[in-house]
Structure formats: structure tokens, C-alpha cells
Regions:
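Membrane interface segments of multi-pass transport proteins and intramembrane proteases
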Residues: 54-70
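Sec-dependent N-terminal signal peptides
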Residues: 4-13
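A small/polar active-site loop signature that marks catalytic segments
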Residues: 73
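Short, membrane-interfacial amphipathic segments enriched in basic
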Residues: 29-40, 49, 68
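Mid-length scaffold segments of soluble, non-membrane domains
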Residues: 78-155
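Boundary at the C-terminal end of the N-terminal hydrophobic targeting segment
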Residues: 16-18
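A structured, mid-to-C-terminal "fold-capping" secondary-structure block
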Residues: 20-32, 135-228
Length: 228
């Protein structure tokens, strides 16, 4: 049962980390998306919607109600600090040395002046740029392939789905010997982040004429922007 619950908590990973839907709505341009698995994707999207609505969202709201804001903010900043090395490595693999340098600089500032718990780097000109092994493959010319909705994890495409195992071993919890302990740590961090982001996700589900199509197009457009 514990393993099942921990797995469920991973679902909204992509909704939070792989998309900035508010920015997307401002710059969105309609683009045809290859959706070879449409029927499956549509059904899995409905499954993930129900999972979010009836399990993840209530858990996140309960967590928010009992956890002081400064603790949640500290955990969120610590989570982002642990991801600096992840982004740094992918920038190097993509030969984007300026972005890698900025990411390294942000990490140093946050660790030295914020003890990893404060986003001290936000007060500097240093920027953080989203990157993962899927975007690295894209920058080296690997095509995205058809859109693919994964159970629990949400929207992906074939390239990004194949990059998931590499992504896992680029983050600290991927090196915890017991996989389910590592997954539990990851799930707890993502649950904390959902406590900040649930209103954006609610807006997508409630105000989109067809949330599956919107999320699919938003995901693919965002990923394309990241590899330019």
C-alpha cells in the first residue's frame, strides 16, 4: 500500500516542472502535434485527472493546512537547490556553457548565503534555465516522437519518456539504495510543491474546453521552446 501511495504522488511531476502554463497561454501558437496514441492518451489523461481530483489535491490541501508557510517555502527552495546539479549537467551535455555557469553560480549563492533553504540567488542577475535529459537529447537532434500520457506521471512524448531513467539517476534521491525510500523522498518534495501550484492546475482543468488537448499542446510547445 505504501508503495502504491508513493507512486501516486509522482503524477503531477510534469504538470509542475515541465510546464509554465501561464507563460504558455501568453505566447501559445497553434501547432499540430503527432498523437498516434490518441485514444489511449485520452483515457489515461482522464485517469490522471481523477487521481489528481480525488487523491492528490485533497492530500496537498491537508498538508498545506497543517504545515507553516515558511517550512513549505524552505522545503521548496531546498528541492530546487538539489536540482541545480541536474540542470548543470544537462547544460554541459548540451554544450550550453553560459547556462551551466549561471546554474553553478546560483547553486553557490544559495548554499553559501541561503544554506540551501533560501533563494538568495533570486536577488542576483543569475538565472536558472529548465533542463533535463529529454531536452538534452532534443538539442542533439533526437525527435520527440508521438505524444504519450503516462499513468501517474502525466504528459510526455516518447523521447522524454525514454529519458526518465537517466533523469532519475541525475537527482540525489536516485542514489538511495532502496528505490521506494528514494521514491518516497521524491514524492514528499513533489507534494510540497503541489501545495503551491494546485490553483494553476485547477485553472487548467476547470477553464479549458478540452483539458487533454490543452495540456498536450502546451507540453509539446513548451518542450519545443526549451530545445531551441
Amino acid at each position: 500500500m505504501l508503495k502504491y501511495i508513493l507512486s501516486l504522488c509522482l503524477f503531477f511531476n510534469t504538470l509542475i516542472l515541465a510546464n509554465d502554463f501561464e507563460d504558455f497561454e501568453q505566447e501559445y501558437q497553434k501547432k499540430e502535434v503527432k498523437d498516434s496514441f490518441y485514444a489511449y492518451n485520452k483515457a489515461m489523461s482522464k485517469f490522471n485527472y481523477d487521481l489528481y481530483t480525488y487523491f492528490l489535491r485533497p492530500v496537498a490541501l491537508s498538508y498545506k493546512s497543517i504545515t507553516p508557510s515558511f517550512i513549505r517555502t524552505g522545503v521548496k527552495n531546498a528541492f530546487d537547490t538539489t536540482r541545480s546539479s541536474f540542470r548543470f549537467i544537462n547544460h554541459l551535455l548540451s554544450l550550453e556553457f553560459r547556462k551551466a555557469g549561471e546554474e553553478f553560480g546560483r547553486f553557490c549563492v544559495n548554499v553559501i548565503f541561503g544554506f540551501g533553504l533560501l533563494d538568495s540567488a533570486s536577488k542576483t542577475p543569475l538565472k536558472s534555465y529548465e533542463a533535463d535529459f529529454g531536452t538534452t537529447l532534443g538539442k542533439w537532434g533526437v525527435g520527440s516522437g508521438p505524444h504519450l500520457v503516462l499513468p501517474l506521471l502525466g504528459p510526455y512524448n516518447v523521447r522524454d519518456a525514454l529519458a526518465l531513467p537517466v533523469n532519475w539517476f541525475m537527482v540525489p534521491e536516485g542514489y538511495i539504495e532502496n528505490f521506494w525510500v528514494g521514491a518516497g523522498v521524491n514524492a514528499a518534495l513533489k507534494l510540497n510543491e503541489l501545495s503551491f501550484e494546485y490553483e494553476k492546475i485547477d485553472d487548467i482543468y476547470q477553464n479549458s474546453v478540452d483539458y487533454y488537448t490543452f495540456i498536450r499542446d502546451a507540453y509539446e510547445q513548451r518542450r519545443q521552446e526549451l530545445i531551441k
